[in-house]
């Protein structure tokens, strides 16, 4: 019998973890009824939870869990702890909670390397909400003696979500801001880190999960264009790029995220140590080929 894992958010990263770990017996939530129907058709015990309503069977499924993985971001309405704190407390076999957070909580570090001991200097509304959620889940685990792991994640790419597909759709831009780099990780590497956390039995703690090479975003687009044999979009200076507020926010802070702790203590080794290996593998799998 496999590990019973309840996922708050059966989305992109959770799906990769489930595919990578056949021993998991998954159940969990999705926001839309249509997505829940798809998951159930695929044999996954899925329930609707969108912060305002939930399926009646969700609470019973949650109480059977041996581990909980939380990948939904803080948003308006009731979050999992607002609605299900009592059910989580009543889960007799629950031994671990894994919360997917963001490296955005570190905020501005002048382009320097940050590890898990670095100050969390975020001033953005999203980052502060994430920090508050980290604290709430950590406290929920502490009061029950349950290990809580915080996985701080960078930009996620993988099948269907990558620079190759952006080029195919005509959406790729090469925005250049001097000395700016982006931290990223392939979704399969995130899934592997989460699998290790669930299986190693270490005390709950914070983990940075990222590849080995933070890189300028314009270089990533250029590499993808080279794989596809198409011209790279022209470079655009950040100062005159007319980005949306959301897109511009990703250029607001400078840091390089270290994965050294996960390598040393979890035995985490990225299968895709940089965007080059990740994009090359995606290209070989057929991503973006209709350009």
Where are these regions (language model features)?
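Amphipathic terminal alpha-helices
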Residues: 273-291
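Catalytic helix-loop patch of NAD(P)-dependent Rossmann-fold dehydrogenases
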Residues: 110-150
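A conserved pocket-lining segment of Rossmann-fold NAD(P)-dependent short-chain dehydrogenase/reductase
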Residues: 165-185, 189
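Conserved C-terminal active-site "lid" loop/helix of NAD(P)H-dependent oxidoreductases
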Residues: 222, 241-269
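Conserved Rossmann-fold NAD(P)-dependent oxidoreductase catalytic core, especially the SDR/UDP-sugar
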Residues: 85-125
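NAD(P)-cofactor binding segment of oxidoreductase domains
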Residues: 58-99
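Mid/C-terminal beta-alpha module of Rossmann-like enzyme folds, strongest
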Residues: 193-194, 200-247
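Glycine/proline-rich active-site loop of Rossmann-fold NAD(P)-dependent oxidoreductases
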Residues: 131, 144-146, 156-169, 196-207, ...
């Amino acid at each position: 019998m496999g590990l019973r894992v309840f996922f708050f958010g059966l989305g992109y990263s959770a799906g990769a973890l489930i595919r990578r770990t056949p021993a998991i017996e998954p159940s969990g939530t999705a926001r839309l009824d249509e997505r829940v129907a798809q998951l159930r058709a695929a044999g996954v015990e899925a329930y609707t939870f969108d912060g305002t309503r939930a399926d009646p069977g969700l609470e019973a499924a949650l109480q059977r869990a041996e581990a909980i993985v939380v990948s939904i971001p803080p948003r308006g309405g009731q979050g999992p702890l607002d609605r299900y704190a009592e059910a989580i407390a009543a889960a007799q076999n629950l031994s671990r909670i894994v919360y997917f957070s963001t490296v955005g909580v570190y905020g501005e570090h002048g382009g320097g390397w940050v590890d898990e001991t670095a100050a969390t200097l975020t001033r953005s509304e999203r980052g502060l909400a994430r920090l508050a959620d980290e604290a709430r889940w950590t406290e929920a685990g502490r009061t029950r003696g349950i290990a809580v792991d915080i996985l701080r994640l960078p930009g996620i790419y993988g099948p269907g979500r990558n620079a190759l597909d952006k080029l195919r759709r005509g959406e790729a831009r090469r925005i250049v801001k001097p000395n700016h780099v982006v931290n990223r990780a392939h979704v399969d590497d995130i899934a592997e880190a989460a699998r290790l956390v669930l299986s190693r039995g270490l005390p709950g703690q914070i983990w940075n999960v990222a590849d080995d090479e933070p890189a300028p975003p314009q270089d990533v687009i250029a590499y993808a264009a080279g794989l596809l044999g198409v011209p790279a979009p022209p470079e655009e200076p950040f100062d005159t790029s007319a980005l949306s507020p959301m897109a511009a926010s990703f250029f607001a802070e400078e840091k390089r995220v270290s994965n050294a702790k996960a390598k040393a203590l979890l035995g985490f080794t990225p299968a895709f140590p940089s965007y080059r290996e990740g994009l090359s593998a995606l290209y070989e799998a057929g991503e973006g080929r209709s350009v």
